[in-house]
Amino acid sequence: MISQLESLKKFSSVVADTGDIDSIQKFSPDDCTTNPSLIFKAVQSNKYKKLFDEVLANSKSRKFNKLNDQVDYIADQLAIAFGIELTKIIPGYVSTEVDSDLSFNTEATVEKAKQIINSYEQSGVPRNRILIKIAGTWEGIQAIKQLEAEGISCNCTLIFSLTQAVACAEAGAFLISPFVGRILDWFKANSSKDYDATNDPGVESVEKIYNYFKKYNYNTIVMAASFR
């Protein structure tokens, strides 16, 4: 009997939102996206101790002005190390996130994105396998516009509205990630109404974005995320 996952794959690309390499090997998604919290959760497991130890040893061989600089370096390199492993087991894209602390700084976001891409390329992973995940703030969207113009594909994340989505598409974002579950969470917390699969406001928001993009011929991919 065909599984729900296999049925879904017939109609849509499936993207894994995890740092667990074993789970990705098990479920064989098309693409994969990670974030710092998922990477942090993954490195708590002894399964990835070798990967963590290699990144830590590399950081100790470098000089840093401040401890925070070393911590930031380790976080970036861990995300890239996991990303490199993921490119070996999935056929499509791996999304790697720019530090959310930079979400309101266009210049710093662009600089960090280029550092991430350079690290991947130095490790033999071509940039066409990587999406740089950037928060859909105004500053983040301006960074995406610049990066896309320079051939660096971006995943515009933390999308909660049609206005945000259109701004990302106008900037040329390769892909956007509307957060279905978090939209539903907000409505549940701020309304006495009952919600189910037939009236989920998160799903309705993604449907509106998808239909708008189709109507006005935007090429930006809509990747619904954060399902509950």
Report each predicted region and the residues it spans.
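N- or domain-start disorder-to-order transition segments that initiate the globular core
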Residues: 1-19
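Structural preference for beta-strand elements that scaffold enzyme active sites
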Residues: 13-15, 31-33, 93-95, 129-133, ...
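Active-site beta-loop-alpha junctions enriched in small/polar residues
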Residues: 19-21, 37, 99-103, 135-137, ...
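Glycine-enriched alpha-helix->loop->beta-strand junction motifs that scaffold or abut catalytic
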Residues: 28-31, 143-154, 170-176
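Conserved, mostly hydrophobic/aromatic
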Residues: 35, 96, 132, 147, ...
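Active-site beta->alpha loop and helix N-cap motifs at the rims of alpha/beta catalytic domains
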Residues: 38-41, 46-137
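Alpha-helix-loop-beta-strand connector modules within alpha/beta enzyme cores
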Residues: 82, 87-88, 118, 141-150, ...
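Catalytic alpha/beta core domains of metabolic enzymes, predominantly
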Residues: 155, 160-228
